[in-house]
A protein has these predicted regions:
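Conserved, well-structured core domains of diverse proteins
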Residues: 1-57, 559, 566, 576-579, ...
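Low-complexity, highly charged intrinsically disordered N-terminal segments
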Residues: 25-102
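Short, glycine-/Ser/Thr-/acidic-enriched flexible segments
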Residues: 30, 38, 67, 101-103, ...
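Flexible, glycine/charged-enriched surface loops at secondary-structure junctions
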Residues: 58, 62, 84-89, 274-278, ...
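A non-catalytic, amphipathic alpha-helix used as a structural packing/dimerization or gating element
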Residues: 66-74, 226, 263, 313
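Active-site-proximal beta-alpha core segment in soluble small-molecule metabolic enzymes
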Residues: 87-282, 289-293, 304-309, 317
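Helical (often loop-to-helix) elements that flank the catalytic cores of nucleotide-handling enzymes
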Residues: 299-314, 363
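Charged (often Lys/Glu-rich) extended helix/loop segments that serve as interaction or gating elements
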Residues: 313, 319-630
């Protein structure tokens, strides 16, 4: 067997595929992050060692603001290149939909670095509007108001416009026109109105129903004409300045995007022919992230195009339609929040313990007193061969099923059941090893890898930190951040620490394809084993919930300065006290109740005074501690 190399690990976990220019493996066999164009490598194992010194324990979310900056620059650069190539005369506006990640430090970094690119923000609810109008200080930057709206939402947006904010209120439903007209008249404001169009075209992938006829938002063609008539009657003809469309998030196929762009461009042309001087087109979201690194439209976790190709299609389609109809090029808005933010966050979790399926003892050999099923199964194991392995496996399954049935009826004892189980799994391991060497593995053996996988119990909550992995089977690249110069000798599924059977991960990125097991190393005693979960910067933080009352994790901001990394900020994860307060427990009252109970227990002689003090001290300490295992 040839010596394992770092290149083997790169290939095994397809790091060069999904890591783009941001993630890789160094000569020590550790995962690193390269946030900036200056190629400074941040060793993730070194970061975790430093955080351990600072008493910051896993799970911990590492945020790299420099990657956010780089993604903004990359998108802007792609538009600049496309504008030059297609002689585009309009302006491009990158708009960040804060629903993707509303965390204040993330939004603040995007706004701060986005100033020189005139980056705007999008809100889809009243709370988001309150955040956006307060933090978006640049008067030229666009604020797009989407989502359901009531009178107070619209009046707040229009008053902000009156004071100088560049706000577009997008009509999603017919009833919003009356609300906008009434608020505009009341406040004496000429609103910037956008209309969301329900395209017939839809996206591809997990969110394709966000577009097309089944989509939740937008006006159909007949409704659009009715809306325009109503706006004319309200003397708001000249206020209609923007059309908006959205065909879904994480669109996997560029052809779907091209089709939608052509349809939207014709809406733009038709509205100009009707006398509406639309000068903005909001292309919505959809620019995907290649989570598995396959660059394939057949995978819901990948895309078959680049940012540059996406931008080229956006610009070319509207330039072509405009030039053919001799109308101005529209200003183009894109809301590519996933593409901007996914790469900047890495979740680091530690493995607490592992379990494996039983296997037959090396010295085991059946005796005359053993049950006949034990002898039969041992003979199957002893005579296994590639030629007969499928038949052997079928026989082993039959013997195991028979043994379980006999045990349930009290005929087979516990020792016999245990021996048969151990031998059965040993047979499965041998059969799996033989099947893997075959050119064409029998279909019924393809699930053996998953059946035989170890369970690695990790210190995190799937529901809090990776909700999309649970809810929609989203793939995230997961890689050990150390020992990548060693051959991984185990296959595992990952289990979280919630009391929920769904709290597990059994889909992984490996070898340019999805796998039900993750290749990992044997855990060493007294040594931390960390796994990095990558590309988690979009949606995961904000969608996470408190199942089993596991709260937000520790979060750390890391930047590159003077050719080295710096830990800029550490945000403590939620404490037990904080999550109990969320579900309406009063921590102080809980302590008082326990003090009364402990006092009674001491007086009745159930525990000593010292034991009572120790119990209360542990309880108070736990209240102010991390919700995860420390």
């Amino acid at each position: 067997m040839k010596k394992w190399t770092i290149d083997d690990s790169r290939e095994l976990y397809n790091i060069n595929g999904w890591g783009t220019s941001y993630f890789g493996v160094n000569d020590k066999g550790d995962m690193y992050v390269t946030p900036c164009k200056d190629n400074v490598q941040i060793d993730l194992r070194d970061v975790m060692d430093e955080l351990q010194l600072r008493d910051v324990t896993p799970p911990v979310l590492l945020r790299f603001p420099d990657i956010l900056d780089n993604r903004i620059e990359k998108t802007s650069s792609c538009f600049k290149k496309a504008a030059e190539e297609y002689n585009y005369k309009g302006e491009n506006f990158i708009v960040y939909p804060i629903k993707v990640n509303q965390m204040q430090p993330v939004v603040e970094e995007i706004i701060s670095h986005g100033r020189k690119f005139n980056l705007g923000l999008e809100c889809g609810s009243k709370p988001e509007l309150h955040a956006v109008i307060a933090v978006q200080c640049q008067s030229d930057s666009i604020i797009v108001c989407n989502g359901y709206k009531d009178q107070s939402y619209i009046e707040l947006a229009l008053l902000a416009q009156k004071m100088g904010k560049r706000i577009f209120i997008v009509v999603e439903k017919m009833n919003e026109i009356e609300l906008i007209a009434a608020a505009a008249k009341k406040l004496g404001v000429r609103p910037n109105i956008g209309i969301r169009i329900k395209l017939a075209s839809s996206g591809s992938g997990k969110w394709q129903e966000s577009g097309g006829d089944a989509s939740k938002f937008g006006l159909r063609s007949s409704e659009l004409l009715q809306a325009l008539q109503t706006l004319d009657e309200k003397s708001l003809h000249d206020c209609v300045r923007l059309i908006h469309f959205h065909i879904g998030s994480q669109i996997t196929k560029i052809r779907r995007i091209q089709t939608a762009l052509r349809e939207a461009a014709n809406f733009y042309v038709q509205l100009h022919k009707l006398g509406y001087n639309i000068d903005f087109v909001d292309c919505g979201g959809g620019l995907g992230v290649d989570y598995d690194g396959t660059r394939s439209s057949s995978s819901e976790s990948s895309v078959n195009y680049s940012i540059q190709e996406y931008v080229n299609d956006c610009v070319y389609t509207f330039v072509d339609a405009s030039d053919k109809n001799e109308i101005p090029h529209p200003n183009l808005i894109t809301e590519s929040g996933r593409s901007l933010s996914a790469h900047h966050s890495v979740l680091i979790i530690d493995v607490l313990e592992t379990t494996s399926l039983p296997q037959m003892r090396e010295e085991f050999e059946p005796t005359e007193n053993d049950h006949q099923l034990v002898k039969d199964l041992y003979e199957i194991w002893d005579n296994l061969s590639p030629r007969t392995m499928l038949e052997n496996w079928h026989d082993a399954e039959q013997i195991r099923d028979e043994a379980l049935d006999l045990f349930s009826h009290g005929i087979v004892d516990l020792r016999t059941r245990a021996e048969i189980e151990s031998m059965y799994w040993s047979v499965c391991r041998e059969v799996n090893a033989m099947a893997k060497s075959m050119k064409h593995m029998p279909d019924e053996l393809r699930g053996l890898d998953k059946m035989l996988a170890d369970k690695y119990f990790c210190n995190f909550s799937l529901f809090q930190s990776l909700p999309d992995a649970w809810a929609i089977d989203q793939l995230f690249p997961i890689v050990p951040i150390q020992r990548l110069d060693e051959r991984p000798t185990r296959n595992a599924t990952l289990q979280d620490i919630t009391c929920d059977s769904d709290g597990k991960i059994a889909n992984f990125v490996t070898n340019r394809q999805a796998s039900h097991v993750l290749p990992v190393h044997t855990i060493k005693k007294n040594e931390e084993y960390y796994l990095g979960v990558f590309l988690v910067g979009a949606y995961q933080e904000i969608l996470g919930d408190m199942h089993n009352l596991f709260g937000d994790t520790n979060a750390v901001h890391i930047s590159v300065k003077d050719n080295t990394y710096h830990i800029d900020q550490i945000f403590d994860g939620e404490t037990v006290e904080e999550v109990l307060d969320y579900v309406q427990y009063d921590p102080k009252k809980l302590v008082r109740q326990l003090e009364i109970w402990v006092t009674k227990s001491v007086k009745s002689g159930k525990i000593t005074l010292e034991e009572g003090k120790e119990f209360l001290s542990n309880y108070r300490s736990g209240l102010y501690g991390y919700t995860y295992l420390e």
